Amino acid sequence: VLTVHRFHRLLALASLLLIASITDVAAEEAVFLSEPKMLQEHGAGEGPVWHPQLGLLTSGEGNINRRDLSGKTSIYREGAGTNGLLFDRRGRLVVCDNVRRQITRIDPDGTATVLTKSYEGQRYNQPNDLTIDSKNRIYFTDPQYGKRSGMEIRDRDGREIEGVYRIDPDGSVVRIIAHEVDRPNGLIVTPDDKYLFVADNNNSLGGARKLWRFALDGDGMPDLASQTLIHDWKTTRGPDGMKLDQQGRLYVAAGLNKPHLPQETADPPTAGIYVFSAAGKLIDFVAIPRDETTNCGFGGEDGKTLFVTAGGSLWSIQTAVPGYQIR
């Protein structure tokens, strides 16, 4: 049966395929096994991360919120002021505290440790999202949205920096990207530590809305000359949070359903999850009927549930392949 929702998804996908000049998607393995299902209307703005005992945590309404294994919701950490969330290999929650402009680690007992709050004496902008590689190095983005008067981080020529940083296990911090990306947002390192994907989401008029890939060396440093454009959202809202599945496919939250003129249009296929093959080819799209799809994360008992945050709401989609989880 061709439902109205299914029709709109197919129409959006047809537009996407035309834009991307993709002609052989039918030959690709299935990506999604269900339509998006709304789980919550409010309280899930960003950073969905799964824990096998706790359930799902999200950033929303100034707190870290919890949706337990039975679906019951509660506040996990009040007044957290966070955006991106990620559990490390020791079960500690590492968060981008964009209100306090720092990266914080929260132990299971609730003890919080600030990992970094400045670089070379300059306070960060708004730490947004993070990823962890196989050597337990933490990479995070530091964009600036809204007013820019409070920005401290600048290069030696006085230019403002919205950069990407890496925290090593010994606590040292290095800036690995400065001006190569306009306004870095979501990011992820591949499981083999060979590549770093960075979402360039500059929502200013004429800003970049692009997905980039950088090759990484053994020390976790990007080869800036390797910078490769994976996809360009042009004038609509660009890429935000992203995750990988166990086949190396990349799921990227992007787009919007209502134009924010003159800065951003609402061109088809609009807001949802864009899926790229391991080779960087756009292979699928599923629409989310809420403005601004912000992030996604895999979870569930079998790892085949993709949780999606969009405009404060929370959605779930069943996938054919489990998501990659830090182990």
At which residue positions do the language-model features occur?
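Compositionally biased, intrinsically disordered low-complexity regions
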Residues: 10, 25-26
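Sequence-structural signature of mature extracellular/luminal beta-sheet repeat domains
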Residues: 27-327
